[in-house]
Amino acid sequence: MATTDETESLVGVLRGTMLALVRREGSDLSARQLAVCLTCYLESEAQTVRGLAATLDVSKPAITRALDRLAEFDLVRRKTDPADRRSVLVQRTPKGTAFLRDLRAIMKEAAKPKPVAAEPAARKKAAAKSARTTR
């Protein structure tokens, strides 16, 4: 079980990752769209709308809306399953693969330890000391 410090660290990584994602140019994905995208790229077998709905425990129409948005950004592509023409397979795209690679880099950056900011009093003292030594 994660300790409080580990949990806080994970929340910090999530926050840093989400901030980087919303600040960057290009696609701005909702949490659901990101979950669908990650499931498509991190699961080894091909995904279907029905399978994604079951895995994520959301309705098929919600998955369809998320896939519509992901397809707009060319992060996934849909293809009719040749083995069962009633089923739709969700395929990866080169742009989606690049997005996942960028996401991993963003998460690594967000996970790096951050320097502790000095307290205002300590900053003033350091500035005063610096001013005295430069005169």
What is the predicted function of each stretch?
Residues 1-28:
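N-terminal leader segment of winged-helix/HTH proteins
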Residues 17-21, 101-135:
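Amphipathic alpha-helical dimerization/coiled-coil segments
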Residues 19-58:
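N-terminal helix-turn-helix DNA-binding core of bacterial DNA-binding proteins
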Residues 46-88:
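Canonical helix-turn-helix DNA-binding module
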Residues 82-103:
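Basic, amphipathic "hinge/linker" alpha-helix immediately C-terminal to the N-terminal HTH DNA-binding motif
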